[in-house]
């Protein structure tokens, strides 16, 4: 388009093409639970200690929670999670703890998990899954409270939350 000579409809059409091209480059987030492929290595989680071992390098990794677990106030995880975490309907209880992860990264999926308890040991708003969600949260529930509690996370940043519900009390945060 020539500067100053394009009609509004031409500008709108060019803007739509550009927007469509940008959207095509973005990775689509799943909106239904992710099935773990045959033949891949799955890490089974049965304790809080095993959760603490999930640090970096989670991209393409699969984690399955085999029973309910409790994370206490001394639990800290500084990981951006980019794997698949399947709670299989189990509950992660937070007892004055930080969230399960620092944040859910763009390729991270957390599914089929219930979160309950209290957020503590934090200095800013956070949720059961940390500060932000860029990936997907599917078939999950959260029921938390605390001075800085924010439901699943402080913010949804291009991520998807589907078939999930959030309850709780928070004097400072949003409960999504």
Where are these predicted regions, by residue range?
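Surface-exposed repetitive/solenoidal architectures
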Residues: 32-176
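Beta-rich interaction/scaffold domains
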Residues: 1-38
């Amino acid at each position: 388009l020539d500067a100053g000579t394009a009609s509004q409809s031409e500008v709108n059409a060019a803007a739509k093409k550009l927007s469509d091209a940008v959207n095509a480059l973005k990775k689509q987030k799943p909106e239904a639970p992710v099935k773990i492929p045959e033949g891949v290595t799955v890490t089974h989680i049965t304790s809080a200690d095993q959760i603490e071992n999930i640090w970096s390098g989670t991209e393409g990794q699969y984690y399955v929670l085999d029973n309910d677990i409790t994370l206490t106030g001394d639990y800290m995880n500084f990981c951006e999670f980019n794997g698949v975490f399947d709670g299989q309907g189990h509950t992660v209880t937070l007892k004055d703890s930080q969230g399960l992860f620092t944040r859910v990264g763009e390729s991270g999926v957390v599914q089929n998990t219930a979160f309950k308890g209290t957020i503590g040991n934090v200095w800013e708003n956070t949720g059961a899954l940390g500060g932000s969600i860029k990936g997907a949260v599917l078939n999950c529930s959260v029921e938390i409270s605390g001075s800085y509690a924010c439901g699943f996370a402080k913010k949804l940043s291009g991520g998807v939350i589907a078939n999930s519900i959030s309850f709780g009390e928070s004097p400072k945060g949003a409960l999504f």
